[in-house]
């Protein structure tokens, strides 16, 4: 029996590895960054609106991959979302950077459209990228303990701490409590987050919640396609931003990005047709996120989260500012120049 159990466990690990991630490690094993990302990834509530032609029957609010249409071209995504070949298999991107005291996990949620349902006095745009960064303290346990969360809602950041946590308001006031919720697909308590329909601003649940139709996404090694706009159990696949062919590696791809951290998007085709107003180049990758009226620079929520955490929160004990793992540092000069020179993008 013991031998069969080990064989079954090995087979499970091999299957998960083939999917790009492995299951969370037992307490005695060293944890990988992929395992950390899976353990802490949010239970995610997505409000869905099916009103009007730009909603695509609700699909404009479905999470998906940046290459949902089979290419890494930013300027065809609005129209390709309406084609029969578009994939809405659920996905979210992640990265992990690390110091001696903390792990910082960023999650990036992508939609092909930031849309509106009426054509007057409103704007929409091609591509939409919002998300969050978690600060997890290395407390000696396998996965650490969640201390803080900062989310991106358009051009504003919102900060949260878990109930009973030790971090408090710093230069920015804490905006609320991040709930921890269970998943039917694993044994962990996950942060609960939510995105609004249409514009997809992201906050802690239930500061945003499902109003009528909506999808509840659960982190996984596989990406499921919602059965409808009112599916309450959809698994989303986690994709490593730092993979060899990942989004970070594509940062200088001019078909996908118009500048460092800003997606290329235009107003051709259906976006901006008639009396709708469609802005161009209006969505950001994590290294382009910018609150605009806080001290940390453009992109630092993802690229220097220790700095941002020290600014946003009052933190007891030690918080190292020296990274032991941070692939963003390879482009430090370019990121600094982008923060100093690029116009602010309002997502």
Where in this protein do the model-derived segments appear?
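Secretory targeting and sorting signals
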Residues: 1-29
């Amino acid at each position: 029996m013991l031998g069969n159990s080990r064989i079954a466990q090995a087979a499970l690990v091999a299957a998960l590895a083939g999917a790009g991630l492995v299951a969370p490690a037992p307490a005695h094993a060293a944890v990988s960054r992929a395992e950390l990302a899976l353990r802490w990834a949010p239970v995610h509530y997505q409000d869905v609106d099916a009103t009007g032609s730009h909603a695509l029957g609700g699909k404009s609010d479905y999470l998906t991959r940046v290459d949902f249409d089979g290419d890494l071209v930013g300027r065809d995504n609005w129209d390709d979302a309406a084609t029969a070949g578009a994939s809405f298999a659920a996905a979210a991107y992640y990265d992990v950077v690390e110091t001696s005291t903390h792990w910082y996990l960023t999650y990036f949620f992508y939609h092909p459209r930031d849309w509106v349902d009426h054509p007057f006095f409103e704007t929409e745009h091609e591509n939409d990228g919002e998300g969050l960064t978690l600060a997890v303290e290395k407390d000696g346990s396998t996965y650490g303990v969640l201390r803080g969360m900062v989310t991106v809602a358009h051009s504003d950041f919102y900060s949260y701490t878990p109930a009973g946590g030790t971090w408090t308001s710093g230069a920015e006031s804490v905006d609320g409590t991040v709930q921890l919720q269970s998943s039917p697909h694993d044994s962990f308590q996950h942060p609960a987050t939510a995105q609004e329909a249409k514009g997809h601003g992201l906050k802690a649940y239930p500061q945003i919640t499902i109003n009528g139709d909506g999808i509840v996404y659960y982190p996984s090694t596989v990406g499921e396609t919602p059965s409808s706009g009112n599916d309450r159990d959809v698994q989303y696949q986690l994709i490593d931003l730092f993979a060899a062919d990942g989004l970070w590696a594509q940062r200088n791809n001019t078909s996908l990005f118009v500048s460092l951290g800003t997606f290329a998007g235009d107003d051709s085709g259906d976006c901006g047709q008639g009396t709708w107003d469609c802005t161009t180049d209006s969505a950001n990758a994590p290294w382009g996120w910018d609150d605009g009226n806080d001290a940390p620079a453009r992109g630092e929520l993802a690229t220097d989260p220790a700095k941002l955490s020290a600014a946003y929160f009052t933190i007891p004990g030690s918080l190292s500012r020296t990274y032991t793992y941070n692939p963003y540092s390879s482009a430090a000069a370019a990121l600094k120049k982008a923060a100093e020179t690029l116009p602010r993008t309002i997502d």
